[in-house]
Amino acid sequence: MPSIVSITSKTLVQSNSYFPWIGPQEYESVGAGSGIIISKTKSELLIVTNYHVVEDTKEIVVSFIDEENVNATIKGFSERKDVAVIAVKLSDIKKETLDVIRMATLGNSKELKVGNGIIAIGNALGYGQSVTVGVVSALDRKIEGDTYSNNMIQLDAAINGGNSGGALLNSKGEVVGINSAKYSSNGSSSSASIEGMGFAIPFSDITDLIESLSKGEEAPKGASIGISGYMIDESTSKSYNMPTGFYISEIVKDSGADKSELDIGNIVTKIDDIEVEEFNDISNYLYEKKAGDKVKLTVKYISGRQYKEKVVTVTLQ
């Protein structure tokens, strides 16, 4: 497709030698990925891809539909959302190449339904553009990070190494997602032994982020309530006769929580209208907020021998 590119990333990797007197050795590692041409400015062509495709690279090379290779630079990225925008100078692209490439047509991922037909396009295994087809297997699948989770589109189209950053298209040929991960039997998104479980980032969820990154702006850093603690799951709840939710074990001094009516021992069950079933429900919600915003926390607190409920407003920092 004229709007899809192949990406080759080069990274310096350091490894220790078997012989201690030689010391650490550096070598160049080459990775493959894909990207989607989303817009063109007066001086640059902008391409969206996964952040992990271009993370810590010393050189990024973009290959267009006519196999013309051009260097690119990172315009902006969000590690948390695994999204990056890279830029190619128009002055570096031949006129013949500019004549054949196209901007991707963007669709609305919120209109997707389970069972809808989809097309996945990417640079599978670094061999160049390839196309696979399938259906939407599930929506809003939570893929866990270290301290956060992202809601993903699950698909059964084949997703292999190098497909990351490529386009997920609906039946109209519109981009509705960015192919991002394939899960294997050990739970990683590396080589596959489980088939039919690919994942893509819903495009409508990251439209505003991509617009900001395209301008060279920093990704949102989110905001903080000023609490720490641990989750009370169903098992713990039954064992100790406590409500499920996030148990506050510490309140940071001079934080928004410290200046509110929150107390240690409170159990947060909702943040605004979001049910708190895991800590990621809180951290993901706060990621979209900024300092000065207010949130309402529904909390359970012990009163005598029973728990009562109250709503506390907290100003974020």
Predicted segments, located by residue:
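N-terminal activation segment of mature serine protease catalytic domains
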Residues: 1-18, 34, 58-59, 113, ...
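A conserved glycine-rich beta-strand in the N-terminal activation segment of trypsin-fold
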Residues: 14-46, 68-73, 103-105, 131, ...
